[in-house]
Amino acid sequence: MINHYRCKYESSSAWSESEMALRGIYSHWITEDILAMSRPNTPQIQSIELIKQFHATGIKSIINLQMPGEHASCGPKLQPSGFTYDPNDFMKEKIYHYNFAWKDFGDTSMTNLLDMVKVLSFALKEGKVAVHCHAGLGRTGVLIACYLVYYLR
């Protein structure tokens, strides 16, 4: 697959198989139950059968840390949801979807961060969780690190 997008995180063509915990999307298992990943998009979800991969690996929830409309110019066209995918596509397949609008390269309040940590903790009681922002690095890593510090202290 050739990446015709401005951002290397929009396609798997920039990554080796060892850099993708799930086939076809930049992703890494941080713990046995928490997957960090780049944002998915509708064509990719279909072509790599992402929902099927979620079911096969036990992922029951997806946490989206993007703001609607974010990074509209570097990847596939945004859906009416304001994201590169329709969250309903996951929910109709019994995968919970949570969205916390957190500005890229921005900060968030301690209250908001604690709310996100609590939701991540709750979601983990249902099964494995995939967390993404745009690239699956900054906000995704901060949330997962905060969860690990808070719950594994």
Identify the residue ranges that each predicted region occupies.
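Cysteine-based protein phosphatase catalytic domain of the PTP/DSP
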Residues: 13-128, 151-152
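A phosphate-binding catalytic loop at a beta-strand-loop-alpha-helix junction
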Residues: 127-149
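Eukaryotic intrinsically disordered, low-complexity, charge-rich
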Residues: 1-12
